Structure formats: C-alpha cells, structure tokens
Amino acid sequence: MKAFLMYKDRDFDLQRKLPPNEQALTQDLELDTLFNAMALGDKFLLEVAKKAVLFGLHNDLDTIRYRQNILQDCLKNASIVRHIYTIAVESIESEKKQYLGFLSKYPDTLLRRSIEVLQMFVGMLKKLKHIADEHADTFESEGFTAFFAMLNKELGDEYFASVQNHLRELQFRDGVLISAELGKGNKGTNYILRKPPDKKQSWVERIFTEKPPAYSFSISDRDESGAQTLSELKDRGINLVANALAQSTDHILSFFTMLRTELAFYVGCLNVHGQLAQKGEPVSFPLPVAPGERRHSFKGLYDVCLALTMEQSIVGNDVNADRKDLVIITGANQGGKSTFLRSIGLAQLMMQCGMFVPAESFCANVCEGLFTHYKRKEDATMKSGKLDEELSRMSDIVDNMTSNSMVLFNESFAATNEREGSEIAWQIMNALLEKHIKVFFVTHLYEFAHGFYDKKMENAIFLRAERQTDGRRTFKLIEGEPLQTSYGEDLYHRIFGTDN
C-alpha cells in the first residue's frame, strides 16, 4: 500500500540531502519563521516542513499542480485530513510501545508481539476504511481519489476477515501442530508448521469419529530440561511464520510512516493558512509555468514571514515583470526594498513546493535553483575583507547554479567604493543574463543601476521604493528610473526629531 500524496508515482524521501545553499536561504529569507508556523512546536512537522519546502526547487510542473490540488482538498476537508494524520501518528506510537518484542531471539516471542501489533494495525486500518467509505466523495484531487480508491481495493471485508482468521489460528490455543522428518542420527529435521484439522464437526462427531493412531508422551511439571527442549521444537516449527508475520507488520508500519510523513506537509500548510486567515491576510494558488517562459507577475504580494510576526496588516505589491530577466530595485532607505526581495524568494519556494502563496494572485516560471547573495555584517570569523567574502560567496553560487536559476541580490558589492562596486556588479550581471539567470537586485549603487537603465533593455524592469513628498514611506514599489539619492536625510530627521 502506498499513499502517494506528494508525488504521483513515488514516496517522499525524507532522508534526501538539502540543497548546498540551505543555510543561506534560511538566513536571508527568514525561513525559520515559516517553518515554525507550519510546525507549531511539533518537531516532526518542522523536519518535514523544512525539507518539503527546500526540496521543492526540484519539482516539475506536474508535481506542483498535483500537490496544489491535494492541498485544496485539504483546505476544504481540514478536519478529515487531520483525523487521518492522527490515525497514522497513533499507529506509529502504539507500535513503538511493542518494539521490545522485535529484539527477542525467540520466534514464539516475536510471533506474539507481531500478533498484538497486527491486531492494533487492523483496528487503525478499519478507521481509515471507514473514512474512505464516508468521505471519499468530498475529495476531488487526483491524489486523494487514488488514495481512497487504494484503501477500498486493498481493505475490503474479505481482507479483514482473512487477517482475523489467520491471527486467531496463530494464537495456537489448542497447541501447535508441527511435522518433522528424521535426519542423521535420528535427529529431527525439516520442521514444518501444519494447519490444524477442521473443527467444523459437531461435538458428537468429534467424540465418535475414529481417530488416526497417534503416539504421545507427557513431560513432568518438574522436568525443566524437557520443557526447554519442547519449547525449542515449537520455535523451530513456527520460525518461518513468525518471520512472515513480522514482515507483514513492517509493511503496514511503512505505510503508516509514509502516510504520516506526506500528510505532515499538508498539515503544516493548514497550520500556516489558519494563522494567515486569522490575521485577514490573503492567499492564492499560484500559476506555475515552464522555466523558459519568463513570467513573474503578481498582485498584493507580501512577505509571509513578516505577516506571521506582525499584528498589523502588511502592505502588498503589484508588479508585472513578465518577459523580464533583470529586476533592479532602488529607492528610499527603509522603504520596503529588502522586504519585497524576501517576499519574492518566499513566494517562489512556496509555489514550487506546492503551497499557496501570500498574494491575491501570482504567476511565475519555475526556477531550477534559487540563490541569495545578501550583504553580511563583518564579524571576527571572517578570514578576509568584506569584499573578498562577498566575491567568495558569489563564486560558490556560480559553481552550483544552472540555467533558469534565480538569484536575489541585496545590497551586494557595496563593501567598496561606488565605482568599483558598480563595475563588479555590472560584470557579474552581464554574465548571469547571458546564461539565462533571472536576477532581482536591491542596490544603492547608482552607477550600476542607472547604467542598466540607460541601456533600455527589453528584458529589464526598474522598481523604486515609493516615497511621499513629506518623506513618509508607503512600503510599496513603483516602476521608475533609479535616483541618485536614497533619502537618508529622512531617517536623520525622523531619528533626531528635526524639521524636514
């Protein structure tokens, strides 16, 4: 049995290695805020959230749409989905309580433990089957439709009756029937467990029916050695069936484990959705397109991590950057540029892992890699100057990127003077654009920004943090020519309370 709720045809691999730039992405996009909102204190949900979001960069369009449809079902049937998740968790936790039986070297102990676990699993599977019978019609996605169809096919009444019958026989309430052969030195070999005779006869028939000849012996209650030998004979006979039953419990356990893992992603999405809905923030399911289409347009896009930590409503942005490879963002200090850049990265990750996005509408091409190059504070761990450190990080990014990747730059190459920083940024941008890399660049380097503006490139767009005439920030971005000032005097007047 397979859940197949993350991919159409394979399981979700929780042991897969994270991207090499995982630490930088987490730091620069403040992903821990998103992960914690998905987990709500649950360590397992946290692990799945982190890996599902970061692994999403490798998803194709079909996988993204597949998950979107499943998530839409989850949002419409949240209580049912959480109930299924609870059943999976309870099954795994109950199995752990019986784990010591698996450590035994004795087949009899292993068999008894497997019977107890399988009895518990049967009860949990019946709960899943009941949910499928009652609620399958309320789910529309391909993933859940296939999941419930699998449950109905695999978990019919005949299956449960057969399992219960086998478990009842394996309890050996009337003893164990074993056949054996004589080997060398008259030692017993080829011990085989046999099915007990049919007990459908009436008690009268059992009394008067002639029985085949049999030879038997009894062991004294005090004969410990004889009892031990008899126990060993029994273990030889039931060894194969004990191992087979243990494998059956492992098979069902692996199903519940994967069901829990794959549903954990959707439970995390439900957790975030609930928090955003409580704050009145909009979400929508994005329209992903192929990498080469170069689409990036949205309405009301906001920073989801900021929204999760703020009490007041967050300002969203409307941008149409379709057919653009380069987006340069300039303008007033503390005008929302870095927040906007973070919202771009977060929305891309959320879209590609199959989530909703923090926007009224969103359409973008998928990227084959997402990288961040943010300015870093100087600290004692740096082995060289800030510019050398920036160039070293840029080299690492280049080593790992492919065509159709996306890079987010935040005030990069500003550790040197204006002219040198602009020249470095200029050379790097030209190289990236030649390789079909999409770039979002927040910068105060006027020569760099205006140099590209003067080129009148069709595949570039220039955004500016809006500033009102009285110096107030609207935290919205508008399309406009880069300016030579970042209005730092506004901050001076605000901090020191002087007149503008």
What name fits each language-model region?
Residues 1-184:
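Conserved amphipathic alpha-helical "coupling/scaffold" segments
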Residues 107-110, 114, 234, 245, ...:
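Amphipathic alpha-helical coiled-coil segments and their boundaries
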Residues 113, 251, 255-258, 386-389:
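Alpha-helical initiation/capping and key positions within long helical/coiled-coil segments
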Residues 129-140, 162-163, 167, 171, ...:
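Long, hydrophobic, amphipathic alpha-helical segments used as structural scaffolds
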Residues 168-223:
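Structured, charged N-terminal subsegments at the starts of enzyme catalytic cores
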Residues 217-249, 253:
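Extended, charged coiled-coil "arm/hinge" scaffolds of SMC/Rad50-like chromosome-maintenance ATPases
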Residues 258-305:
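Charged, amphipathic alpha-helical linker segments immediately N-terminal to NTP-binding catalytic cores
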Residues 291-500:
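ATPase nucleotide-binding head domains, primarily ABC-like/P-loop NTPase cores
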